[in-house]
C-alpha cells in the first residue's frame, strides 16, 4: 500500500482512499466493518474461506463484516484503488493475520511500500 489518505476520520466512521499493489493475505478486523468501493484496478478476493473467491473491478463494492476472514489473493490489473469506509473508525493496528508469519500491522504497511 503506497497511498492511504483519510477523507474523514470520525469516531463513528472513517473514509479513506488507498492503493494496493500486491496481494493481501488472509486477515480480519476485530473492531470495525469494512466497505471497499473499487475506484480502479481489478483483482480477486474471498471471504469466509478461500474456496469462495470472486473477481472484482472498478464500480464494485466489497463488504467485510468485522471478524470475517478475507483476502485479496491476486491483483490482476493494478494498482487497485479503493475508497474504504470503516464503521466505526478502524484503528490502523486492527488487522489480525490468520497466519501470524504473514505479518503484523506494522510490517504489513511497511512491506507494501513501493519505496
Identify the function of each model-found stretch.
Residues 35-58, 68, 95-97:
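A short beta-strand-loop-beta hairpin characteristic of the jelly-roll/cupin
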Residues 8-11, 73-115:
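Double-stranded beta-helix
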Residues 4, 17, 45-47, 72, ...:
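Short hydrophobic/aromatic-rich beta-strand segments that constitute the beta-sheet cores
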Residues 1-26, 32, 85:
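A short glycine-rich, His/Asp/Glu-containing loop-to-beta-strand
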Residues 22, 31, 52, 68-69, ...:
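A generic "binding-loop/recognition-motif" signal
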Residues 56-76, 85-87:
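Conserved metal-binding segment of the jelly-roll/cupin
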Residues 15-19, 35, 53, 61-63, ...:
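Conserved hydrophobic/aromatic beta-strand scaffold that supports enzyme active sites
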